[in-house]
């Protein structure tokens, strides 16, 4: 009984310690979006750091692959394939889906990858990711930090609007033992909050 109570307390502490998403460093105006029908979307991972130690993606991948392969032969190699496919399979689709469910359904502005004909491009620059973990009795959410910039498609040096999304939490009801899926939930939360902010700004 004491063990169960202790685990429950530890779970509550971990849950309460999770930092909520925040937006910072907002600059520019979103007024240019009011008459738009399509916005191009690009995802960048050039500046990505991971974990509390801010390691590079290569450092993170090499260390985790080695750890998993040492635990079970081939496990790290299988994980690497999932990691490499996670961007296009989970992270980016979840972000785009929530932009559709917030901005597109409210304002009629579609957000699409590979839409070079669109006058404006949203650049989603993933800067920091914490994968989180799930140990059944306790878990910690993933966290995703991004810089979201609207630029002219034909002149990307011209930044019209930019904001920093800090530690968007990634989790879902129940248990999720996949780091990649938890991170995807963080991208989804980023888009959900950012989409609501866009709708709010365009009402002014």
Q: Can you name each region flagged by the protein language model?
A:
Residues 23, 109-158, 169-173, 177:
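Surface-exposed short loop/turn segments
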Residues 20-93, 196-204:
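A structural "domain/chain start" motif
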Residues 21-33, 49, 158-204:
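C-terminal/domain-edge helix-coil "capping" segments
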Residues 1-25:
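Bacterial Sec-dependent N-terminal signal peptides
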């Amino acid at each position: 009984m004491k063990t169960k109570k202790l685990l429950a307390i530890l779970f509550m502490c971990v849950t309460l310690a999770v930092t909520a998403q925040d937006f910072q460093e907002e600059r520019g105006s979103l007024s240019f979006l009011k008459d738009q029908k399509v916005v191009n979307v690009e995802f960048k991972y050039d500046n990505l750091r991971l974990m509390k130690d801010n390691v590079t993606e290569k450092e993170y991948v090499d260390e985790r692959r080695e750890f998993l392969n040492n635990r079970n032969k081939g496990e790290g190699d299988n994980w690497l394939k999932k990691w490499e496919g996670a961007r296009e399979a989970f992270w980016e689709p979840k972000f785009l889906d929530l932009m559709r469910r917030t901005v597109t359904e409210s304002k009629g502005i579609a957000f699409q990858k590979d839409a070079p004909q669109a006058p404006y491009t949203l650049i989603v620059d993933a800067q920091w990711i914490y994968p989180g973990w799930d140990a059944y009795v306790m878990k910690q959410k993933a966290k995703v930090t991004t810089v979201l910039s609207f630029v002219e498609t034909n002149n990307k040096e011209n930044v019209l609007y930019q904001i920093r999304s800090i530690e968007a939490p990634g989790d879902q009801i129940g248990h999720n033992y996949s780091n990649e899926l938890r991170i995807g939930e963080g991208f989804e939360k980023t888009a959900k909050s950012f989409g609501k902010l866009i709708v709010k700004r365009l009402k002014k």
